[in-house]
Amino acid sequence: MASAVLSSVPTTASRFALLQVDSGSGSDSEPGKGKGRNTGKSQTNKSTTNEKKREKRRKKKEQQQSEANELRNLAFKKIPQKSSHAICNAQHELSLPNPVQKDSREENWQEWRQRDEQLTSEMFEADLEKALLLSKLEYEEHKKEYENAENASTQSKVMNKKDKRKTHQGKDKPLTISLKEFQSEDHISKKTEELSSQILSHDGGFFNRLEDDVHKILTREKRREQLTEYNGTDNYTVHEHNQEVVLKDGRIERLKLELERKDAEIQKLKNVIAQWEAKYKEVKARNAQLLKMLQEGEMKDKAEILLQVDESQSIKNELTIQVTSLHAALEQERSKVKVLQAELAKYQGGRKGKRNSESDQCR
């Protein structure tokens, strides 16, 4: 099962992949053996196919062995070895004759160190992924065993309880238990607890913890590599860290100043708002007073007008009374004048008659 998984998982190049496999079957196809050409050709074809098959098998075995060794190293917390291909390339390039090698050695050292770190980190991550997959497969394989053990323990507990109940039926006194039985029960309970704890630990949270541990291990190794760097790089990183801290402090102070400025502006705006609120209240009170005054003035005007109307009405009534009285007096005077006119007419007529009579008498 583990070999099938390892063949399906994408793996990194191991140390043994660079080695050339020497096949011992080449002696069969060598010339000068005293055989015919036709038979030699058929045998050479067969030998080449056999050699290819053997090489493939050997390569597979070597890959499996290398992967198993890497997994063992991971299990015993060994640091994975660097790739031999990168080391060989580095040695080959360093051995080449280069006139400017002394000047550019420091720059090339940093580049090679970075490449080496990348390769080791990639290999380590791939090996950790393999270990995680293998642990998951082992858990899936042993899951049924854990479940069977748990079921057996629960069944044994139930049977023990039933037996105890049967023995206790019809008896008032409790039965005495020997030391061996008590210890055996404790041992069974401890086993069941251990099995349950193992089952719980093999749940989904277990793999999350594994991933967290892997992440922590990677971070620790990176920190160790950073600490093991030479003093110049350490000083440079410390200087950069100090610069970052200073920049962060400057940014924090700038933000604090901006916050204080904004707070002052907010306080000023609050004061302005309070002043405008006070003015608004004053204007509102004045408007209320003006409304009252206008209402009172209108009421006064109305009252004065009503008084004037009453006075004019009373004067009108008085004048009408006077006019009626004067009209009555006029009528009386007119009647008197008529009476006097009648009397005058009578008097004048009497006088005319007297004159006529006197004239007649005179004649």
Swiss-Prot record:
PTM-bearing positions, type Phosphoserine: 23, 25, 27, 104
GO MF entry, a single one: identical protein binding
Comp. bias (Basic and acidic residues): 102-111
Keywords assigned: Coiled coil, Golgi apparatus, Phosphoprotein
Compartment annotation: Golgi apparatus
Stretches the record annotates as Disordered: 20-111, 145-171
Family: Belongs to the GKAP1 family.
Region feature (Interaction with IRS1): 1-93
Polar residues bias locations: 39-48
Descriptive protein name: G kinase-anchoring protein 1
GO biological process entries: positive regulation of insulin receptor signaling pathway; signal transduction
Main location: Golgi
Originating species: Bos taurus (Bovine)
Function description: Regulates insulin-dependent IRS1 tyrosine phosphorylation in adipocytes by modulating the availability of IRS1 to IR tyrosine kinase. Its association with IRS1 is required for insulin-induced translocation of SLC2A4 to the cell membrane. Involved in TNF-induced impairment of insulin-dependent IRS1 tyrosine phosphorylation.
Coiled-coil regions, chain positions: 43-75, 126-158, 240-350
Subunit structure: Interacts with PRKG1 and IRS1.
Gene Ontology CC: Golgi apparatus
InterPro entries: GKAP1 (IPR026109)
Lineage summary: Eukaryota, Metazoa, Chordata, Craniata, Vertebrata
